């Protein structure tokens, strides 16, 4: 039984987690992930772990051919903070009056929404789906 615990730390932690998971998984020829029962952690580490897990699923479904490719690490390390920094400096003045609908529910667009949009763009929408 394998339990993976990731640490927080923003985009560096996301990249580190992604790199470590790729290395362990490639070295063990996928056996480590087959025996993984729990992936837990915080912040950037969980983003990296979620992205890697999504890549594994995409490979199993035949959507991608090789989850170990370098460009996946490059994707997760792309800038996600410029848009957020702009929103923080403008104090969400213009953004808070915008909303979006998801599955019949209306949500206010905020920094979290902007972060999610940038993450989806950076990772080619691989994480852009409902969990239910």
Show which residues each predicted segment covers:
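Catalytic domains of lipid- and phosphate-ester/thioester hydrolases
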Residues: 1-132
């Amino acid at each position: 039984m394998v339990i993976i615990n990731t640490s927080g730390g923003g985009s560096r932690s996301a990249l580190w987690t992604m790199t470590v998971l790729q290395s362990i998984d490639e070295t063990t020829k996928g056996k480590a992930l087959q025996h993984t029962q729990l992936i837990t952690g915080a912040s950037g580490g969980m983003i990296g772990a979620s992205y890697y897990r999504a890549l594994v699923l995409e490979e199993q479904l035949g959507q991608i051919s090789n989850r170990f490719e370098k460009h996946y690490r490059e994707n997760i390390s792309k800038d996600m903070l410029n848009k957020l920094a702009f929103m923080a400096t403008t104090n969400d003045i213009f953004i808070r009056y915008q909303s979006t609908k998801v599955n019949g529910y209306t949500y206010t667009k905020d920094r979290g929404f902007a972060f999610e949009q940038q993450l989806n763009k950076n990772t080619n929408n691989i994480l852009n789906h409902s969990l239910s």
